[in-house]
A protein has these predicted regions:
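Amphipathic alpha-helical interface segments
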Residues: 1-98, 128-164
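Histidine-centered, metal-coordinating catalytic motifs and their short helical/loop contexts
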Residues: 96-119
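Surface-exposed beta-strand edges and their flanking turn/coil or helix-capping segments
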Residues: 106, 124, 154-156
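Interfacial non-cytosolic loop connecting adjacent transmembrane helices
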Residues: 118-124, 129-131
Length: 164
């Protein structure tokens, strides 16, 4: 869990950028919490057979994980604009493609009512180890997917911290 935003509150160049940083940290921490919950949910599964309550909990934890990751990427983009830092803009331009899977997965789940069609019905959300599938698309939910987000946040903090 991160607790850096308040320590560097004088570093962002605008009030909006500071609030974006604070909110970004909240969603990064939310993703960490959700990832930990997903791991606990997976460990609690009894093996073959379906415990519907545990599966529902796991599915909803995965959904909120994608929401947190997607919201964090939106806030990172917003922070790069409101802070007017070329370093942050370049960082965002470099990292933006890495966040597309989070956005795509979140879109599927947030707009599930539009996915209730023949082509999706065979896969409205399944789990294969550390891969969540939806409509035949595969989305990584392993530790490396979380690392994309935490590394991005740490790079933002380092850029801001390096300012005089």
């Amino acid at each position: 869990m991160y607790d850096e935003a308040l320590k560097i509150q004088s570093k962002p160049r605008s009030f909006e950028a500071f609030v974006a940083l604070l909110t970004l940290e909240r969603y990064v921490n939310g993703a960490i919490i959700q990832w930990d919950r997903i791991q606990a949910d997976k460990e609690a599964l009894p093996g073959p057979g379906v415990d519907r309550t545990l599966m529902l909990k796991l599915f909803l934890d995965i959904h909120f994980y994608f929401i947190c990751c997607d919201k964090a990427q939106n806030l990172l983009g917003y922070l790069s604009k409101t802070d007017s830092s070329q370093k942050l803009v370049r960082l965002w331009q470099t990292l933006k493609p890495n966040f597309k899977p989070f956005n795509d997965a979140r879109n599927h789940l947030e707009h599930i009512e539009t996915r209730i069609k023949k082509e999706y019905l065979f896969d409205l959300g399944n789990l294969e180890n550390d891969t969540f599938t939806f409509g035949g698309e595969r989305f990584d939910i392993s530790a490396s997917s979380l690392k994309i987000l935490t590394d991005a946040y740490e790079q933002v903090v380092n850029i801001l911290r390096s300012r005089p």
